[in-house]
Amino acid sequence: MGNTTSERVSGERHGAKAARAEGGGHGPGKEHKIMVGSTDDPSVFSLPDSKLPGDKEFVPWQQDLDDSVKPAQQARPTVIRWSEGGKEVFISGSFNNWSTKIPLIKSHNDFVAILDLPEGEHQYKFFVDGQWVHDPSEPVVTSQLGTINNLIHVKKSDFEVFDALKLDSMESSETSCRDLSSSPPGPYGQEMYVFRSEERFKSPPILPPHLLQVILNKDTNISCDPALLPEPNHVMLNHLYALSIKDSVMVLSATHRYKKKYVTTLLYKPI
């Protein structure tokens, strides 16, 4: 009895192994398809590692190498404006993969943002007070999901004037730098300038030269009133002048300004 049961179990196991062996084999020219990714897009279905004749071998870094060979598009400063009101306005679009909302700055009655966008077409939308809306006054496009977005086309030709002005500014700055860095004209030699002793130890004057022009020492014109003095220089104001002592009398003078008039006061003091 025990031997019969053992043989039956052994036979069932052997049959299962044979069935698995038959199921694991493939007919000539037949392969199972393996679906990878989303089933919404039939283009993502792929076969196992089967290579057709003439296929190229790609190394893992070849895609990065191809991307590095492509020239990078220059970013252009683009003004985005929202004029439909609101308290808080943000913007998001295909230029940042709709990942973040960029705030707009309020300027008078509008909201403005200056974004550095690469050349080409970009879709964008505004987030105003918690709702996604588009600007009806700007070009629009319907996305693949059926939503209406604004469309902007950044072209290089729109910035040719700014590029020309920038190039002209750079050239003018380089020219001015060359002019400043150039040496003054004239002969050059190897001899060092030697200071003379009187130049080295020259001391400043006791009295500044412009204070030597005292209006009381000047002669008065005959055609002028002798009580009127010529208009003094501004450096002569608020200084005290003294006349040489004669006949035991000292004379002091000072000139002051009151609005548009000048008053010279003389003080006589006996000694």
Curated annotation (Swiss-Prot):
GO terms for biological process: cellular response to nutrient levels; fatty acid biosynthetic process; positive regulation of cold-induced thermogenesis. Phosphorylated when associated with the catalytic subunit (PRKAA1 or PRKAA2). Phosphorylated by ULK1 and ULK2; leading to negatively regulate AMPK activity and suggesting the existence of a regulatory feedback loop between ULK1, ULK2 and AMPK. Keywords: Fatty acid biosynthesis, Fatty acid metabolism, Lipid biosynthesis, Lipid metabolism, Phosphoprotein. The modification Phosphoserine is found at S38, S68, S94, S107, S157, S169, S173, S183. One of its GO terms (cellular component) is nucleotide-activated protein kinase complex. Residues 1-46 are annotated as: Disordered. InterPro entries: AMPK1_CBM, ASC_dom, ASC_dom_sf, CRP1_MDG1_kinase, Ig-like_fold, Ig_E-set. The modification Phosphothreonine is found at T39, T147. It comes from the Eukaryota. Non-catalytic subunit of AMP-activated protein kinase (AMPK), an energy sensor protein kinase that plays a key role in regulating cellular energy metabolism. In response to reduction of intracellular ATP levels, AMPK activates energy-producing pathways and inhibits energy-consuming processes: inhibits protein, carbohydrate and lipid biosynthesis, as well as cell growth and proliferation. AMPK acts via direct phosphorylation of metabolic enzymes, and by longer-term effects via phosphorylation of transcription regulators. PANTHER family: 5'-AMP-ACTIVATED PROTEIN KINASE , BETA SUBUNIT, 5'-AMP-ACTIVATED PROTEIN KINASE SUBUNIT BETA-2. Belongs to the 5'-AMP-activated protein kinase beta subunit family. This is 5'-AMP-activated protein kinase subunit beta-2. It comes from Mus musculus.
